Each structure stands twice: as structure tokens, then as C-alpha cells.
């Protein structure tokens, strides 16, 4: 079966044989995708004219009602999406929930936020500002929807959440969506869009999806559009310098490689709640989605005198995690999504091993449960130890997108700050400490290079949402998630639909009507 693309209000199969999407446990080919023959320029123009006009004619609360209907539909088909996640991504039930339920929760959050925005079609920002000695001439800022398309080039790890965490604020803002999911796991995103289209929830052109290669997509975006990319730093670099993107000053939001940190405070000794909470969170981040999360912990910073004990504690927990076919009882860690991702993980792991010792795992020949290692895409959870600190290179520059993390001991707070900053900006850091003096120096020292800093102490306990969870009510992002022309990048939060909106200043006479 070949998955069709939804463009110019029609379902169209791409030409040729296309690429196969496989089961990463068995290697079985499931479906095929192709974007060959799709007129991307026509698809984008149809979205701008038909989809954009229809969405902008609706009020915020009307758009919010459509998001609520989408969430209800996705919830009703949750079991079908879990099955696709299992077959195409090798997801355990917990992994599928993280993606699918996360998507549904996010859409619901934006639906609630949009309803609260009321019957307007654009937003006033702040009050009137005097521009003259008297109030006869004033200014007012507005947030206006872009007249173009929100183009999403998404990553393979979250085909559901990755689509809807971007699409929900765009649709709420009145901007049509053009989604290009990552090829290896495109099936789930395509099915969700197909279900929404079949239900007739959105007007024609409000959402489009193309599965397969991006081809000439960036040749046809304009200054009225916004492009959002999640993926590798290498691809991101090519996108930033694409001739059309540069020539037309296209807004582009990039979320690329990120070596996120978990940082243990000097007070978090073995036996303390903070130590135990750190162990639990590190293991969870290494195993949920098999470590295939942009926000996953890649570096573990711990006081030199405690680092070995922390490594032993994490290793002990990892030893109890069953790795194998998610269809088998008790399996906690599934495969990576493809053999290509497995090869990339092994390549990155080889670089890390040049300056690290292996504390746990790292065996390329380990035997997963109920799976053939020769055809499956498993990587054993691996904990490394690097005592080179700032002198190390790969540990701070290479993100192994899998169940791999590196323990890095630090000498004092200043050293911890320097090591965390050596990642050149990350999406998130989590800190496990109740030491006010330590936190007072560390958090301000790393905040400007992190999209989010989560502090966990004994009082917080297990009530926190998690190091790697992205909440629609809270910003995340950072220097590794940049927007051209907008400064430090971030992800939108519910109630903040500004990413697909454009700020405009409007000087006016004091007696002029407010739009």
C-alpha cells in the first residue's frame, strides 16, 4: 500500500515505487510513500488562498472549537494510532502514549486557550501608547496572522505530537498548515491527517500533508510563510543557507541537536531524595522512546566525589530494564525506528568511546528479547563515563539519538556551569538539589543557554512533569531551537499563539476606532 498525499484539497499518490516504511523489530515493509510528481508550488498557493482565507474568516473561539473537535476525533481513534506506533516505530505502550496522548493533550490545551480568546480575529497586545505630548496621537500593537503557510518539516521520533504541537497554534492563529513528516515514521501523521480530513473538521487547504522527500519545497516558500524544522544540525545548516530562504528572508524556526544535561547538586549525596530522584529521571530519559527525544538527558553532571556512586546506581536500574520486542511481556525498551538510525547511533557511540569508558551496556552484539538482532534496530542502553571535563570534545558536541548518556564529574559550581555551557545551548537542563547557594549560582549561570531549567528537590519529589516532557503551558526551546529574525527560539505555549502571528504597530488618532 502506498500512502497518498493531501494537497490542493485532493488525495494524490506520489509517482514511482517510493520508499518503504518498515517495522524496526521484524524488518517487514509496511507501507510506501512518495512525493514525486506533487506540485509543491501549487499546494502552497492553494493553502495560502483557500485555506488561509477560510481560517481567517473564523474567530478565535470558532477555530478553538475545531481544535476541540480534532482532539475528540484523535481520542476516539487512539487504539488505531497505538497500533501504528507499535508497528512502524517499535513503540512500547508507554512510548506510544507519550506521543499520541501527548498530541491529544496539546490540541486540547490550545482549544481551551483559544476559547478564552473570544470572538476576535486578531489580538491586541498591551494598551495604547502615547506618541505625542497629548493623547491626540497614539499607537497600538496588534498580533496579526501571517498571510502565508506554516510549513512543518518534522522529525521521526514524534510523528503525532510533533505534528500537532506545531499545527494547533498555527490553526488557532488562522494560518494554514503544510506538514512534511519524516519519512521513516510518516504513517501515523498521515493517518491522523486523513482522519481529520475525512471528518470534514477543517476547511479545504487548512491542512496539507506530503509524505516522502521534501524535494523542492524550500524553493517555493515566501516571506509570508514560516518554516519550522525539527531534525539534525547538518540539515538545519543547509536550510538556514538555502538561497530562497536567504533571498526572501523567510522566517525559519530550527530545533536541532541538543546535548541536554542532568545536574546533581553537591548536597545530593547517596541516600538523599535528590539523589534518588536524579537516578529515576536519568533512567527514564534513557529508556522512554529508547532515548529518541530531543529533550533527553545526554550528559549527567555530578560532583566528582559522587559521580561513581551515581553511575553505579543508574547502571543498576538499567540492568533491570528488559530490551526487546514491545509485543513481549515486560519489555520496557524497544528498538530505534530504523536500521539507519541504529547505524547512526553506533557511529556516534564510537566517537564518544574515544574519550569515555563504558560503565554499562555498549555491546553491539547483545541479544534483544524476542527479536532477531540481524534485522532489528536495537541499541542496548549505554552509560559512559568521561573524566576529561571541558577537555572532552565529542561528549559536548555529539548527540547520540538513542539510549545513551555520559557521566561527567565536576569539581565545583563554576566548573559545573562551564561544562553545562560547553554544550553551546540546549533545550533543557534539570537540576537535583536543595542547596540554595548552589542553585543561586548555577541556574543564572546556565539559563541564557537553555530553553528551560527544571529544579527538583525533596519538596517537589515525584510531582514534577519530567526532565524531557514538553508542556503546552510552558515554554521550551533555547539557542538550539532558533528563529531567524526573532532571536532565541522557543516553542509556543498554550495561550501564546504568537509564533504564526506577526506583530504590527498602528499609530492612530485618539478618536480612531480600535479594530
UniProtKB/Swiss-Prot annotation:
Induction: By benzoate. Residues 479-488 have a biased composition (Basic residues). The active site is at residues 255, 294. One of its GO terms (biological process) is catabolic process. Gene3D superfamilies: Aldehyde Dehydrogenase, Chain A, domain 1, Aldehyde Dehydrogenase, Chain A, domain 2. Its EC number is 1.2.1.77. SUPFAM superfamilies: ALDH-like. It catalyses: (3Z)-6-oxohex-3-enoyl-CoA + NADP(+) + H2O = cis-3,4-dehydroadipyl-CoA + NADPH + 2 H(+). Optimum pH is 7.2. Keywords: Aromatic hydrocarbons catabolism, NADP, Oxidoreductase. Residues 489-515 have a biased composition (Low complexity). Homodimer. NCBIfam families: PRK11903.1. Catalyzes the NADP-dependent oxidation of 3,4-dehydroadipyl-CoA semialdehyde to form cis-3,4-dehydroadipyl-CoA. Belongs to the aldehyde dehydrogenase family. This is 3,4-dehydroadipyl-CoA semialdehyde dehydrogenase. The lineage of its organism: Bacteria, Pseudomonadati, Pseudomonadota, Betaproteobacteria, Rhodocyclales.
Amino acid at each position: 500500500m502506498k500512502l497518498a498525499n493531501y494537497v490542493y484539497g485532493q488525495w494524490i499518490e506520489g509517482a514511482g515505487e517510493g520508499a518503504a516504511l518498515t517495522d524496526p523489530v521484524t524488518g517487514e515493509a509496511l507501507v510506501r510513500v512518495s512525493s514525486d510528481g506533487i506540485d509543491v508550488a501549487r499546494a502552497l498557493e492553494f493553502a495560502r488562498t483557500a485555506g488561509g482565507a477560510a481560517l481567517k474568516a473564523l474567530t478565535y473561539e470558532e477555530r478553538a472549537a475545531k481544535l476541540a473537535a480534532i482532539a475528540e476525533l484523535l481520542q476516539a481513534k487512539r487504539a488505531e494510532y497505538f497500533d501504528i506506533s507499535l508497528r512502524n516505530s517499535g513503540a512500547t505502550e508507554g512510548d506510544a502514549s507519550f506521543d499520541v496522548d501527548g498530541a491529544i493533550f496539546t490540541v486540547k490545551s490550545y482549544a481551551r486557550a483559544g476559547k478564552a480568546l473570544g470572538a476576535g480575529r486578531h489580538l491586541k497586545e498591551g494598551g495604547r501608547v502615547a506618541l505625542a505630548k497629548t493623547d491626540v496621537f497614539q499607537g497600538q500593537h496588534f498580533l496579526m496572522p501571517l498571510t502565508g503557510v506554516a510549513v512543518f518539516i518534522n522529525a521521526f521520533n514524534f510523528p503525532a505530537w510533533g505534528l500537532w504541537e506545531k499545527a494547533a497554534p498555527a490553526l488557532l492563529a488562522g494560518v494554514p498548515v503544510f506538514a512534511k513528516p519524516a519519512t521513516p515514521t510518516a504513517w501515523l501523521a498521515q493517518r491522523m491527517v486523513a482522519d481529520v480530513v475525512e471528518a470534514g473538521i477543517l476547511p479545504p487547504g487548512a491542512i496539507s500533508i506530503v509524505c516522502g522527500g521534501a524535494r523542492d519545497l524550500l524553493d517555493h516558500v515566501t516571506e509570508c510563510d514560516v518554516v519550522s524544522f525539527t531534525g539534525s544540525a547538518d540539515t538545519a545548516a543547509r536550510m538556514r543557507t538555502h538561497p530562497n530562504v536567504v533571498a526572501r528572508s523567510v522566517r525559519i524556526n530550527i530545533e536541532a541537536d541538543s546535548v541536554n544535561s542532568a545536574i546533581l547538586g553537591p548536597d545530593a549525596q547517596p541516600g538523599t531524595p535528590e539523589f534518588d530522584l536524579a537516578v529515576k529521571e536519568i533512567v527514564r530519559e534513557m529508556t522512554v522512546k529508547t532515548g529518541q527525544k530531543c529533550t533527553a538527558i545526554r550528559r549527567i553532571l555530578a560532583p566528582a566525589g559522587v559521580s561513581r556512586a551515581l553511575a553505579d546506581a543508574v547502571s543498576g536500574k538499567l540492568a533491570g530494564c528488559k530490551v526487546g520486542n514491545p509485543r513481549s511481556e515486560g519489555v520496557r525498551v524497544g528498538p530505534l525506528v530504523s536500521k539507519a538510525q541504529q547505524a547512526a547511533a553506533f557511529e556516534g557511540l564510537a566517537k564518544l568511546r574515544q574519550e569515555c569508558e563504558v560503565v554499562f551496556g555498549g555491546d553491539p552484539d547483545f541479544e534483544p528479547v524476542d527479536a532477531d538482532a540481524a534485522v532489528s534496530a536495537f541499541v542496548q542502553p549505554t552509560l559512559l563515563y568521561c573524566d576529561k571535563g571541558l577537555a572532552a570534545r565529542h561528549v559536548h558536541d555529539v548527540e547520540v539519538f538513542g539510549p545513551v548518556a555520559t557521566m561527567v564529574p565536576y569539581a565545583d559550581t563554576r566548573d559545573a556551569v562551564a561544562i553545562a555551557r560547553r554544550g553551546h545551548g540546549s533545550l533543557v537542563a534539570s537540576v537535583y538539589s536543595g542547596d540554595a547557594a548552589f542553585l543561586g549560582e548555577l541556574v543564572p549561570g546556565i539559563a541564557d543557554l537553555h530553553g528551560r531549567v527544571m529544579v527538583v528537590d525533596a519538596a517537589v519529589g515525584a510531582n514534577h512533569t519530567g526532565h524531557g516532557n514538553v508542556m503546552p503551558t510552558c515554554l521550551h526551546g533555547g539557542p538550539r531551537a532558533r528563529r531567524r529574525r526573532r532571536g532565541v527560539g522557543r516553542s509556543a505555549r498554550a495561550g501564546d499563539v504568537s509564533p504564526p502571528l506577526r506583530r504590527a504597530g498602528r499609530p492612530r488618532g485618539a478618536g480612531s476606532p480600535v479594530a
